[in-house]
Amino acid sequence: MRLIPAILLALVATSPALAQSPDLIFKKSTVFRLLTPDDKLATYAIDDPEIEGVACHYTVPERGGVAGGLGLAEEVSDVSLACRQVGPVKFKAKFEQGDVMFRQSRSLLFKRMQIVRGCDEKRNVLVYLVYSDKLIEGSPKNSTSTVPIMPWGSGEPPRCKDWLK
């Protein structure tokens, strides 16, 4: 019976959405606190693990204070997102509309932030959406960013519709 949780944990841990950690670009204090950590905005970068040549930057609020310093504060759902083509686009595998590109816990137990991807077939544009959800209910707060797939060097750019499942 103890084997089932271990197997589930192994499956979750090997997911491409969890395989990489974002790179911290910088943090900026927004609320000064004298004896505890300040509230901050933190900007991170992450490469799409399934599509080479695409990177996303996102900014999240990080709570300070005693609860934030101990990692117990529930973070708010405000997240901004910007994704860009940073090199030649190369698809590593087929994907489905709405596949999770990145997932991160935003509270001790229940809240998580997710970046999902899709393909606008008509315009050959990758579409990224970031949102937060909870065990019971999610937040309507979200941000969307698009990446038109452009030629990089010589040759035609790939068509994202050819890589949809």
Q: Which residue ranges define each predicted feature?
A:
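Active-site-adjacent core segments of small-molecule enzymes
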Residues: K40, F110-R117, K122-N124, I136-N142
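Mature extracytoplasmic domains of secretory-pathway proteins
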Residues: A55-E121
